[in-house]
A protein has these predicted regions:
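C-terminal alpha-helical interaction appendages
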Residues: 1-29
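N-terminal membrane-targeting/anchoring modules of bacterial envelope and secretion proteins
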Residues: 12-16, 27-32, 39, 49-57
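Short, charged/polar micro-motifs that form catalytic or ligand-binding hotspots
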Residues: 34-35, 97, 162, 290-297, ...
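Conserved active-site-adjacent core of cysteine acyl-enzyme catalytic domains
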Residues: 35-54, 72-222
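Short helix-capping/linker segments at secondary-structure and domain boundaries
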Residues: 50-62, 312-317
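Accessory carbohydrate-recognition regions in carbohydrate-active enzymes
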Residues: 67-69
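Noncatalytic regulatory segments and standalone regulatory/sensor domains
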Residues: 177-298
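Charged, long alpha-helical assembly modules
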Residues: 291-446
């Protein structure tokens, strides 16, 4: 947990930002409960907003539900990944795009709708990144992006490499010597060696060494307009609006869920669920399905209960009591999503029930921040998930050419690839390089 001198650093940093006296600044920080977060980006932003003194529409501290709703709220997407030599896997998203912290759009949107300013910074090397992080942490808490799988409290569904470099955000509260104090979703803060933190931050490509701080004093919109805009964005996304273009766009929104339903009940004759995931792969796919709905920092029920809390707050802000009825509907919908997740690994099939219990044990240990339990469970996964890869020729190892030379030959698109620009997706082309790049792009959860 955070040591006394670390807490004093936070108090003095708040004094410098707000002009408060020591007792007032300390009281404000001490009042902040050791809350258990639900969603990493929402929880991290709530922490930064509290430290910056940014209030919600009612004058109190913004809730995590309010941040989720203002950031864009709900969404939906379904993807099946099949490659020769690899076990097929399934992914379902239930929040607005992108559900994971591939960029800062969700955080920036929510903060600006609350009238806060976001200051983003990146670095070109680990040494420069550490200097920038230390300088920012000296003034207050900092949000940073890193690879979730590198953290000692990250739960495991299967082998570490199965998740790839899953982007994640934490709040760095203090740096003492060679140890950083991090706040994630557990009630207590974690202390992590700076070398581990640097490795986790360097693992990402587009978000490499990215940090973000929040400050008060932005152009605060009318809270009612902000809430209306946020709800409209959520409605559009559920309707299928997507930044993704091409054939993959049909997998988003309610149309994407309809395609999944057709695959499950066999109406999709081309690729029914039982053909994509035969008995040898069924446990693997069903375990991932439950993980994405219940355990992937959704708060359970695919974010629907948390969004219902936002709708209750929106009803008060907009003075529209009818939204409370919609909130009740979303709580019922969340219960239905949880029921679907439970049906994926039911009690009456003993091996599936064992997988579900193992998932819950790991998840509970991670939520408690019980590192001892996490160490015992590290890299352990259930025999039912040890599925043989799908038959087929193993992917050919592609020949590589120097990235900088490729970028020079590729013009603007090559430069975009070289620097990990947003929106790049490898094109299909004859030869192994493009196919292998596309395979790596899709095998990591979107």
């Amino acid at each position: 947990m955070t040591k006394d001198h670390d807490f004093k650093k936070l108090v003095r940093a708040r004094m410098a930002r707000t002009g408060e006296r020591y007792a007032a600044a300390r009281a404000q920080l001490a009042r902040k409960p050791a809350a258990v977060g639900v969603h990493p980006e929402s929880a991290a932003l709530v922490s930064l907003l509290a430290a910056a003194g940014v209030a919600g529409p009612g004058g109190g501290a913004p809730s995590e539900a309010l941040v989720l709703g203002l950031g864009g709220g709900l969404g939906a997407a379904c993807f099946t990944f099949e490659y020769a030599g690899h076990t097929p896997t399934f992914y379902v998203a239930t929040r607005c795009q992108p559900q994971y912290a591939y960029d800062e759009r969700f955080v920036r949107t929510a903060a600006e709708r609350l009238g806060a300013r976001c200051e983003l910074a990146t670095a070109s090397s680990a040494a420069v990144a550490h200097k920038k992080l230390a300088a920012r942490v000296a003034l207050g808490p900092v949000m940073t992006w890193l690879s979730f799988g590198e953290l000692p409290w990250a739960p495991r569904l299967g082998p570490v490499g199965e998740l790839g470099a899953m982007p994640h955000v934490v709040v760095v509260e203090a740096i003492t010597g060679d140890v950083a104090t991090l706040r994630d979703l557990a009630p207590a803060a974690f202390e992590v060696e700076l070398a581990v933190l640097a490795r986790a931050r360097a693992r990402l490509r587009a978000a490499r060494f990215r940090t973000l701080v929040v400050a008060a004093g932005g152009d605060a919109p009318d809270p009612r307009d902000a809430v209306r805009d946020a709800i409209a964005a959520c409605v559009a996304e559920l309707g299928g609006a997507s930044r993704v273009r091409g054939p993959m766009a049909k997998n988003f929104g309610l149309p994407g869920l309809a395609r999944w339903a057709a695959a499950l009940d066999g109406r999709d004759k081309k690729k029914p669920w039982t053909r994509v995931f035969p008995p040898a792969h069924a446990a693997h796919a069903l375990a991932w399905t439950r993980h994405w709905i219940e355990l992937a920092s959704t708060g359970g029920g695919g974010f629907r209960p948390l969004y219902a809390d936002f709708l209750d707050e929106a009803a008060a802000i907009l003075r529209r009591p009818a939204l409370r009825s919609v909130a009740r509907d979303y709580r019922a919908l969340g219960a239905a999503w949880s029921g679907l997740a439970t049906a994926a690994l039911p009690d009456h099939i003993a091996p599936f029930a064992a997988v579900r219990r193992a998932q819950d044990t790991r998840h509970a240990a991670s939520r408690r921040g019980d590192l001892a339990a996490m160490r015992r469970l590290r890299d352990a996964f259930d025999p039912e998930l040890r599925c043989a890869p799908r038959r087929g020729r193993a992917p050919r190892r592609p020949r590589r050419r120097p990235r900088r030379a490729a970028a020079r030959r590729g013009g603007a698109r090559g430069a975009l690839r070289l620097f990990g620009g947003a929106g790049h997706r490898p094109r299909r082309r004859r030869g192994g390089v493009r196919r292998a790049a596309r395979r790596r792009y899709l095998m990591s959860p979107p």
